[in-house]
Swiss-Prot record:
ADP binds at residues 161-168. The keyword Mitochondrion does not apply. Keywords: Kinase, Nucleotide-binding, Serine/threonine-protein kinase, Transferase. It comes from Janthinobacterium sp. (strain Marseille) (Minibacterium massiliensis). Belongs to the pyruvate, phosphate/water dikinase regulatory protein family. PSRP subfamily. One of its GO terms (molecular function) is ADP binding. This is Putative phosphoenolpyruvate synthase regulatory protein. It catalyses: [pyruvate, water dikinase] + ADP = [pyruvate, water dikinase]-phosphate + AMP + H(+); [pyruvate, water dikinase]-phosphate + phosphate + H(+) = [pyruvate, water dikinase] + diphosphate. Its EC number is 2.7.11.33, 2.7.4.28. Bifunctional serine/threonine kinase and phosphorylase involved in the regulation of the phosphoenolpyruvate synthase (PEPS) by catalyzing its phosphorylation/dephosphorylation. It comes from the Bacteria. It is an enzyme of class 2 (transferase). The keyword NAD does not apply.
Length: 282
């Protein structure tokens, strides 16, 4: 079996994300792959490459980068039209064509041609999926940080945890990415003294998922916001984290630590644990 060729990596490698739409798909896939390498990357986005003139302009930019860097740029491309893709393929770059790699084999397997519609997943602003996402975002904003107890029956998931444990960004990610209606409520010292969940949540315990965090990391985050305060003191953070975890265990609430997890990993865990199945996007 052949072995990978070992090269002396340069300090920074240029990466182009080329698309005839927004470039979100190319960028998301590219990021997932690039994180597997302990190298620095300079990222260049080239969205809306939907005419030959724009494709030749992208070709010029890639070749200029090759001349300046002395090494091939890496290209992640989602150009649907073959004529545009063939232009970019003439560049002095290492070309990763996601359409050819995945769509064409699927056409053969499924026995049907794809629609080859440019930017399809990001332009269906009138679709039911888009409306659901907007509704979910509005719901999550209205139910952020315990602002409202109204209409909790409509929530898909209710996140609880100490302040600054990642509840708000996770709620908004679930809403924006999956159309999940996520409310979130802070667990505070008053709740620990009463040994009860925040008012109104008991009836929806089956929807609750908890987020915890390492006390030292929590202290770091809180000190960025309120340096030197009791709120950010390590001793207080330890108390809140310990009490919150004790409450979640007592109430039988599923929970996880967000300390070393990305928002994407947290969201994926929640979807799996709560048994939520986000719809396949158009």
């Amino acid at each position: 079996m052949s072995q990978p060729v070992e090269r002396s990596p340069a300090s920074t490698r240029t990466v182009f994300f080329v698309s005839d739409g927004t470039g979100i798909t190319a960028e998301t896939f590219g990021h997932s792959v690039l994180t597997q390498f302990e190298l620095r990357f300079k990222q260049v986005r080239l969205p809306f490459i939907d005419t030959p003139d724009k494709a030749y302009d992208a070709l010029r930019k890639i070749n200029e980068t090759f001349a300046a860097d002395g090494q091939r740029p890496i290209i992640f491309s989602t150009l649907v039209k073959a004529d545009l893709s063939s232009i970019v393929r003439q560049s002095q770059g290492m070309h990763m064509d996601l359409i050819q790699t995945f769509v064409e084999p699927l056409e053969q397997e499924l026995g049907v041609k794809s629609t080859h519609t440019i930017g399809r997943s990001h332009t269906s602003t009138d679709s039911e999926e888009y409306k659901n996402r907007i509704e979910a975002i509005n719901f999550s904003l209205a139910h952020d940080d315990g602002q409202s107890h109204k209409n909790l029956s409509a929530a898909d998931v209710i996140l609880v945890g100490v302040s600054r444990s990642g509840k708000t960004p996770t709620s908004l990610f679930l809403a924006m990415q999956y159309g999940i209606k996520a409310a979130n409520y802070p667990l505070i010292p008053d709740d620990f003294e009463r040994e009860k969940l925040p008012g109104g949540l008991q009836a929806y315990k089956h929807k609750i998922f908890g987020l915890s965090i390492a006390a030292d990391r929590l202290a770091e985050i809180r000190n960025e916001r309120l340096p030197g305060s009791k709120y950010a003191a390590l001793e207080n953070c330890r108390y809140e984290v310990n009490e919150a975890e004790r409450m979640m265990r007592r109430e039988g609430i599923r929970w996880m630590s967000s300390t070393t997890k990305s928002i994407e990993e947290i969201a994926a865990t929640i979807l799996q644990e709560i048994k939520l199945d986000p719809p396949i996007k158009d």
